[in-house]
Amino acid sequence: MNNFKKLNNITGWLVFLISTIIYLVTMEKTASLWDCGEFISAAYKLEVVHAPGAPFFLMLGRIFSLFAADASQVAIMVNSMSALSSSFTILFLFWTITAFGRKIYFKDGNIEQSKLIAVLGAGVVGSLSYTFSDSFWFSAVEGEVYALSSFFTALTFWCILKWEEVADSPHSSKWLVLIAYFIGLSIGVHLLSLLTIPAMGMIYYFKNNKYTHYGAFKALIISASILLVIQGIIIPKTASLMGTFDRIFVNDFGLPFNSGVLFFFLLIMSLIIYGLVKTKL
């Protein structure tokens, strides 16, 4: 198994290197003629893009833009962020494919050379096929949110597979907390990453329960409901509730502007810290 892990890591990084070279070589050198110009200029000046916004993408884009020699190089640096995000997506896709292959072929713990080649080969073929697919390659070479969103999608799903490997060990819930954190960050890029929630919910169900048709259907409904709650309530209502707090603190209590926002932020942080301490994570 140690030999498989070593080869799995080496092959994964080789696939990452191939995809990185391809995307950087074929990368757009300026702004493509659609939303990319908006995102690149907004990242450079930390401004606001069209609704619903992409604050985390813009902050990362701003960091990349700092490496530009002058303003004419900003687009290249933001586009390179998409290229690197996409190549990391390919890396985690490779490891996801090999993780499934390992569960299929290595059930008894014996790793035959033919099966080892088959699993690694499946990972290479699958990940490189996606590398050169039209839609993904298109988004990988320009300053748009879809490349970074794909990265978070691949990363969160890979994390649930890592959790599944150690689910029976102490403190395995740390992986679930990490997934929640990444999902929160991905909301600041694009909402597409939330679509991994039902799939991760099914993996959680299969790991902790004996399969039944009713149980699988119930798990699917619950995980889909979590997606709807995040999408329909938590995301839109959090900012609204923050504004309500600020209005009460300013109008009713006579406190300075943004005092309600600060209180709301401290309240949320306190609840998170309490939850971490209570669960001993």
How should each PLM-predicted stretch be described?
Residues 113, 117, 156-175, 203-214, ...:
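Membrane-interface transmembrane helices that cradle and orient dolichyl/undecaprenyl
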Residues 1-22, 88, 110-124, 267-281:
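Start-transfer (signal-anchor) and selected internal transmembrane alpha helices
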